[in-house]
């Protein structure tokens, strides 16, 4: 009896030892494979935001009565390979060609955000001029979003969001904080706006006139985890988030980008289904159920489909451009509304 029990104990001990050895071998193999994967992936050098090369800026606000705009560019790069064969999932801010790609969008946005379009100014008083800053950052490549995995997107974009927060902290430390603050971004830049709202402290939030999430989503989890994210309800409210995504029909919503819990029509600033007319021929209607803009009278043909992922019933690429006059005017309106609520700040240049 005792001998049988002793044998069972030895067998159990042997099994435990074998399991431990197998676990150790598995762990070592995983570590080796992980290191090999890391060595095969290239991470670009971090930006130095004290270097003017890392920024696009425009200062049209000579009078000092405008807003400070911090803009985050969208996704411009696909996965690419270094000369030594390593794949990279990020834009390289030290690569001149990559900066040129980002600058195409940034300069076009700066043209209307830093200086309100004259046709959108009702009284032609020349106001609506702003100070515009946009950092180059190591944005994740488009393949990140084409994986259709929220976990993968969150993991891959973590580096990009660190860059954005570092750039913003320097921008915030150097700017005149008595001026209204505008955050804006398109696509992955819209994601960056959401993450910045989580990053900023309450004092910085009090300086916020508005945050514009163009062509990206705000999730219920985002709103639960961040008291700074408050959906805009009209044209003049401040400290709010403006979010919109454009589709031809709600069936074309791209979930990883546009499955949002908030939305507003940037043409009439309504959150219901009241239609608005844009450029005389385009009808823009918000879907209160899906919080996206459904357009008719506009094909978006100038934006070809991208790998059956974007611009395939959605019109993702139009977001900063189709409504540019509406956005330029609204930035002015919300900045003025912020100044009305903060009169003690108004005498500062």
Show which residues each predicted segment covers.
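A short acidic (Asp/Glu
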Residues: 81, 144-146, 192-197, 221-225
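Surface cap/lid and interfacial helix-loop subdomains adjacent to catalytic sites
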Residues: 5, 23-28, 35, 163-177, ...
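Active-site catalytic motif of lipid deacylating hydrolases and related acyltransferases
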Residues: 31-33, 72-179, 301-318, 324-349
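Flexible, membrane-associating and regulatory peripheral segments of lipid-active enzymes
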Residues: 2-113, 120-124
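Gly/Ala-rich beta-loop-alpha elbow adjacent to hydrolase catalytic centers
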Residues: 185-189, 193
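Flexible, glycine-rich phosphate/dinucleotide-binding loops
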Residues: 78, 141, 190, 220, ...
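Active-site-proximal beta-strand/loop segments in catalytic clefts of secreted hydrolases
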Residues: 72-75, 136-140, 186-187, 213-217, ...
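Loop/turn elements at helix/coil->beta-strand transitions in domains of secreted/extracellular proteins
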Residues: 65-67, 128-132, 177-180, 206-210
């Amino acid at each position: 009896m005792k001998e049988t029990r002793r044998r069972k104990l030895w067998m159990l001990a042997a099994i435990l030892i074998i399991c431990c050895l197998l676990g150790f071998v598995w762990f070592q193999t995983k570590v080796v494979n992980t290191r090999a994967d890391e060595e095969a992936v290239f991470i670009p050098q971090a930006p130095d935001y004290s270097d003017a090369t890392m920024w696009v800026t425009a200062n049209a606000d000579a009078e000092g009565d405008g807003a400070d705009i911090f803009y985050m560019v969208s996704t411009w790069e696909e996965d690419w390979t270094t000369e030594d064969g390593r794949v990279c999932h990020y834009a390289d801010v030290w690569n001149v060609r990559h900066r040129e790609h980002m600058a195409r969008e940034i300069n076009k946005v700066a043209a209307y955000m830093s200086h309100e379009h004259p046709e959108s100014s009702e009284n032609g008083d020349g106001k609506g001029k702003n100070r515009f800053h946009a950092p180059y950052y190591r944005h994740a490549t488009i393949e990140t979003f084409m994986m259709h995995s929220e976990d993968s997107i969150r993991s891959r974009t973590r580096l990009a969001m660190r860059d954005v927060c570092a750039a913003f902290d320097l921008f915030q430390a150097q700017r005149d904080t008595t001026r209204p603050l505008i955050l804006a971004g398109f696509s992955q830049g819209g994601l960056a706006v959401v993450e910045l709202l989580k990053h900023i402290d309450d004092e910085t939030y009090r300086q916020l006139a508005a945050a514009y999430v163009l062509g990206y989503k705000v999730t219920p989890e985002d709103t639960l985890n961040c008291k700074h994210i408050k959906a805009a309800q009209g044209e003049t409210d401040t400290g709010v988030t403006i979010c919109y995504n454009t589709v031809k029909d709600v069936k074309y919503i791209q979930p990883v980008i546009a499955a949002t819990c908030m939305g507003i029509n940037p043409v009439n600033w309504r959150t219901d289904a009241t239609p608005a007319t844009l450029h005389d021929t385009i009808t823009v209607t918000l879907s209160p159920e899906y919080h996206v803009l459904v357009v008719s009278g506009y094909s978006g043909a100038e934006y070809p489909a991208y790998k059956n992922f974007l611009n395939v019933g959605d019109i993702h690429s139009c977001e900063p451009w189709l409504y540019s006059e509406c956005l330029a005017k609204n930035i002015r309106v919300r900045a003025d509304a912020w100044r009305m609520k903060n009169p003690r700040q108004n005498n500062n240049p």
